[in-house]
C-alpha cells in the first residue's frame, strides 16, 4: 500500500483488529521510508445484482423499494421492526448468493413472499394479491388454501 505521506510503497502492517462486528478489519501501518503511521480499513465488497424488470429494463437493486413494499403489506400487523430488517437482510443475502450480475424482479418478489409467509400470513396474502395480480376472490381462496397445507 502507498504511504499517504511520502507515496512510497514500503509500508508494513503493525497491528490488525476486527471492527464493526467483524465485518471490517482495521490495520495500523507504518511507512518504512518516512516512518509515519496511518490507519486503513478493509471490508468485503459484496455486490447486489441489478434487477431485470418485467419490461426488460434494468435498474440497480433498491433496498428502500423492497422495504416499502414489505412494510406496506405489514401495515397494522404485529411484526417488529427488527423482524422486518432481518427479513430484508435475508433477501439481500440470498440475492448476493446467486452470484449473478443481474436477476429478474420476479426473484425478488418470490423471496419477499417467502419471508412474509414466515413473518405474517395476512401480510403474505396482502403482498401476494398485488404481486400475483389477483383479480377475483377465487385467487385469494386458492392462495389461502395453500397456506393451510
From Swiss-Prot:
GO terms for molecular function: ATP binding; double-stranded DNA binding; zinc ion binding. Binds 1 zinc ion. Its cofactor is Zn(2+). A zinc finger (unnamed) spans 3-34. Pfam families: ATP-cone, Zn_ribbon_NrdR. InterPro entries: ATP-cone_dom, NrdR-like_N, RNR_NrdR-like. Residues 49-139 form the ATP-cone domain. Belongs to the NrdR family. This is Transcriptional repressor NrdR. The gene is nrdR.
Amino acid at each position: 500500500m502507498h504511504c499517504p505521506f511520502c507515496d512510497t510503497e514500503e509500508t508494513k502492517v503493525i497491528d490488525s483488529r476486527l471492527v464493526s462486528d467483524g465485518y471490517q478489519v482495521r490495520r495500523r501501518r507504518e511507512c518504512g521510508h518516512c516512518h509515519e503511521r496511518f490507519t486503513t480499513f478493509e471490508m468485503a465488497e459484496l455486490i447486489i445484482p441489478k434487477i431485470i424488470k418485467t419490461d426488460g429494463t434494468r435498474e440497480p437493486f433498491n433496498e428502500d423499494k423492497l422495504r416499502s413494499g414489505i412494510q406496506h403489506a405489514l401495515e397494522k400487523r404485529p411484526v417488529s421492526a427488527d423482524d422486518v430488517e432481518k427479513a430484508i437482510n435475508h433477501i439481500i443475502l440470498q440475492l448476493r448468493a446467486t452470484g449473478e450480475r443481474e436477476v429478474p424482479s420476479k426473484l425478488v418478489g418470490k423471496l419477499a413472499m417467502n419471508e412474509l409467509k414466515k413473518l405474517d400470513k395476512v401480510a403474505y396474502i396482502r403482498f401476494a394479491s398485488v404481486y400475483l395480480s389477483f383479480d377475483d376472490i377465487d385467487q385469494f381462496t386458492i392462495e389461502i388454501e395453500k397456506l393451510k397445507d
